A protein has these predicted regions:
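Glycine- and acidic-residue-enriched helix-capping/strand-helix junction motifs
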Residues: 15-27
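Flexible glycine/acidic-rich beta-alpha junction loops that bind and position SAM and/or redox cofactors
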Residues: 16-17, 224, 237, 279, ...
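Glycine-rich beta-alpha loop elements in corrinoid/cobalamin-binding modules
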Residues: 42-172
């Protein structure tokens, strides 16, 4: 079979903004399955090309490529405008090309996009790894009329009417696909040198140190119902018709990590529920086989103690640890926002890590949660201080607490049902997104679509975040001073029963367990 060329484009935000170079995990699996089915792929990461050479003319690059089918990923809302602009450029070069767009944001606004854009032919919904080769093959040999037979798509028929087909096709076995190999992409080696920027998520910048970074996908779907999250159980139901989560096997994850190590990757980001992939076993195997990378594990719920202890063991040779969204110090508010664990369980995990000289954990909180008030946030501050106090006598200060506004994801339950939440600020509609992204400057935050209720508006939320940061900074300074002075009770008969950190010092309650004066 003669290989047919398919052009894949990762879009910019706008022609002057190259911030978000990172590929969605799903498109890597889609492209690699096309390659497996004998398609030739030319993949260009447009914002990456802009970063590497700001003077490059993207249109001139594309003119040199003979393409009939273009695939554009549009997973995050950041690309809603840019994906359409890139499609327009492709149509200007080859008016007969067929442009396919996929991803959660394109899916969510699929009707708005097709009504307003003349340059996008098909938007694919739900799973597309196995479906895409069949769609591309029929489009190449039969043209757009072939679209009538396929599920999971929306398109305009020859009369200009929008046909929104049902999602009936699923790729539930994600062990069949390759989400690791990105060598199909132009300048993939340079891509691996980029890491998350310090200003905001997604704003990428070249790291000065030589630590190649990779986000490792291990799960598709979610079994949690966090109301503000765009990747929740609700989100997958409305956008992919998925009712169950798909997980990658431990064997395949270990193989993936071996491949990444061979590519020179030093740092992995993993996001999911560790018990679903048996991560305790995975880390044991990695350690036995001396496969050591720095792992940041973003745990969607709370890791099991066995996994925490195994991470501590693995971290003897690496800088590996956890990020956990504790969200609130109030347990009822935490549960309302999709996290089903209590304060005492958080403290148990924190104490295990605190007693070790390895690993770390960062707990993330937010003031503007569903159902939360300023009173609840005072509980959050108190609980965050209790966690941070563990650093006073720890072998090393490896407990951290972070704060930030809870953003409303585009594809979340809150966004789709905003009238039920008495929001004090309107959510952004499609037109607002397009107008905002069209002129968004490079290097700045995406925006502030924070959850804003009658209890905590955006201005109050931002101020509460600043108050939290100042309180925690003062605590950290006091802890650092205390640790530097090393004023620990050295006698084995003395036991610290209580620690209280105030603005002017660290106060200890010490129990003398002996009958003698010490």
């Amino acid at each position: 079979m003669t290989k047919q060329t398919i052009l894949h484009l990762h879009p910019f935000c706008n022609k002057d903004n190259s911030d978000f170079i990172f590929l969605p995990a799903g498109i890597v699996g889609v492209i690699n399955n096309l390659r497996k089915n004998y398609f030739k792929i030319i993949s260009i990461n447009v914002p990456l090309e802009m970063k590497l050479n700001p003077n490059k003319n993207i249109k001139e690059i594309l003119k040199k490529i003979n393409f009939k089918i273009v695939i554009i990923d549009c997973h995050w809302y950041y690309f809603l405008y840019g994906a359409q602009e890139i499609a327009k450029i492709c149509k200007e070069i080859n008016s007969e090309c067929i442009v396919i767009v996929g991803g959660f944001s394109a899916n969510f606004f699929r009707k708005e996009i097709l009504k307003t854009s003349k340059n996008i032919d098909v938007i694919i919904k739900g799973d597309s790894e196995s479906l895409m080769p069949d769609i591309c093959k029929d489009l190449i040999y039969k043209g757009k009329n072939a679209l009538t037979k396929f599920p999971n798509i929306i398109y305009k028929n020859r009369f200009g009417f929008i046909k929104d087909k049902k999602i009936t096709y699923f790729d539930n076995n994600i062990n069949k696909f390759d989400y690791i190999d990105i060598t199909f992409m132009r300048h993939w080696k340079e891509y691996l040198q980029f890491s998350q920027g310090v200003k905001a998520p997604g704003i990428s910048q070249i790291k000065k140190e030589n630590e190649k970074f990779f986000y490792l996908p291990t799960q598709k779907g979610c079994q949690n119902s966090c109301p503000s999250c765009g990747g929740s159980k609700y989100s997958y139901k409305i956008l992919s018709n998925k009712k169950e989560i798909s997980v990658r096997s431990p064997t395949n994850i270990i193989k993936d990590i071996k491949k990444l190590k061979d590519l020179g990757i030093k740092k992995l980001m993993i996001s999911g529920e560790s018990n679903l992939n048996k991560w305790t076993y995975i880390l044991k195997e990695l350690k036995i086989n001396k496969i050591f990378l720095n792992i940041i594990f973003e745990e969607w719920q709370l890791p099991k103690k066995e996994f925490v202890k195994q991470m501590i063991s693995y971290a003897k040779n690496t800088d590996s640890g956890f990020i956990i969204s504790a969200l609130s110090g109030n347990e009822i508010i935490r549960i309302k926002n999709g996290k089903h664990f209590k304060n005492n369980k958080i403290l148990e995990i924190a104490k295990i890590i605190s007693k070790s000289e390895n690993s770390y954990v960062s707990f993330w909180f937010a003031p503007n949660l569903v159902g939360a008030t300023t009173k609840h946030f005072q509980e959050t501050i108190s609980f965050a201080k209790e966690l941070l106090e563990l650093n006073v006598l720890a072998p090393k200060p490896n407990i951290d607490v972070l704060i930030g506004p809870m953003e409303i994801d585009l594809t979340s339950y809150v966004y789709s049902n905003f009238s039920s939440f008495s929001l004090s600020e309107p959510v952004w509609n499609y037109k607002y997104f397009i107008d905002f992204l069209k002129t968004k400057p490079e290097g700045e935050k995406l925006g502030n679509m924070s959850f804003s209720s009658k209890h905590i508006n955006i201005k109050q939320c931002n101020q509460l975040c600043e108050d939290f940061k100042n309180i925690i900074l003062t605590m950290k300074e006091n802890i650092e001073y205390f640790r530097g002075k090393k004023v620990y009770p050295l006698d084995k008969n003395l036991e610290i029963k209580d620690i209280e950190i105030k603005n002017y010092g660290v106060f200890l309650t010490i129990l003398n367990k002996s009958n003698k004066n010490i």
